[in-house]
């Protein structure tokens, strides 16, 4: 699965796509594995692998974009948080930690926090007790020093996620797009449009400044309607990609992986029709 993810990432990035991976499923360092290595190397080497793939696949100097995330409950989350502190490491990816309410409560109360793997198991194979406050302070320090990791308040995201009511149909949110604007399920894609709030201010920088809410509401409706058309346009482009793959000179064995990848993306786009209409320029109002 780890190698398949890398291959799919490369295939997407060669078409100028960005990718978000959640690494919570990877065994923590030292865990037993059923191969000649005997134990797992943990998260960090795979962070490097995906980062290197991102830097290597470029078009005219423009490389792909990558988001790597992990749950704070994962025993290797501290190593994940520290991974970019060494200069030159994981330079091809943004990294973000998925923070739970339980962890934040432990931070506030200065209590120990139990990490485990698998993170959602009632019978984990690995457990580890840590100081929640110390790890939180490390997150804050590293973000101050190197601008990463980002923080995803995951329980809040899931509580406010409408698509997760269809989690049993394949729409369970697992990570975000590379810039973190929209949490998504596997093989879905981000389609984003922002409304400039400053443009709705009437008589700006005066005592009579006010926000044109009626115009904003009208444009929000139009924006959502436009984004619905964008989904159809995207599926047309995916059809073109699928047609090109069919006519590529490589043998079917080579082409099949990319072809099936785009089939999965098209299916998810058609079923979910996800859009991201947001706002910008709030600070300029």
Residue ranges and their predicted role:
Residues 245-248, 254:
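Internal transmembrane alpha-helices of multipass membrane proteins
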Residues 264, 271-285:
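Extended, well-ordered alpha-helical scaffold/bundle regions in very large, multi-domain proteins
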Residues 1-219, 223, 232-246, 261-268:
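Active-site cavity-forming subdomains of large catalytic enzyme subunits
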Residues 230, 252-258:
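Extended glycan-interaction surfaces of carbohydrate-active proteins
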């Amino acid at each position: 699965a780890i190698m398949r993810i890398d291959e799919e990432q490369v295939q997407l990035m060669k078409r100028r796509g960005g990718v978000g991976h959640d690494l919570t499923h990877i065994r923590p360092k030292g865990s037993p594995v059923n191969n000649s290595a005997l134990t797992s190397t943990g998260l960090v080497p795979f962070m490097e692998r995906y980062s290197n793939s991102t830097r290597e696949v470029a078009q005219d100097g423009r490389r792909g974009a990558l988001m790597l995330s992990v749950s704070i409950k994962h025993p290797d989350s501290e190593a994940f948080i520290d991974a970019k502190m060494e200069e030159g490491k994981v330079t091809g990816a943004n990294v973000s930690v998925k923070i739970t309410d339980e962890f934040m409560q432990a931070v506030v109360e200065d209590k120990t926090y139990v990490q485990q793997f698998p993170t959602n198991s009632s019978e984990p194979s690995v457990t580890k007790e840590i100081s929640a406050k110390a790890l939180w302070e490390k997150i804050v320090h590293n973000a101050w020093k190197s601008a990463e990791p980002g923080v995803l308040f995951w329980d809040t995201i899931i509580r406010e996620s409408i698509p997760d009511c269809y989690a049993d149909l394949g729409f369970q949110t697992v990570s975000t797009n590379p810039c973190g604007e929209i949490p998504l399920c596997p093989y879905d894609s981000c389609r984003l449009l922002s409304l400039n709030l400053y443009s709705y201010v009437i008589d700006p920088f005066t005592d009579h400044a006010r926000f044109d809410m009626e115009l904003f509401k009208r444009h929000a409706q139009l924006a959502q309607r436009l984004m619905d058309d964008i989904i159809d346009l995207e599926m047309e482009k995916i059809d073109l990609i699928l047609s090109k793959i069919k006519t590529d000179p490589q043998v079917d064995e080579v082409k099949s992986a990319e072809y099936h990848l785009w089939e999965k993306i098209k299916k998810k786009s058609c079923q979910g029709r996800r859009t991201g209409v947001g706002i910008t320029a709030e600070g300029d109002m």
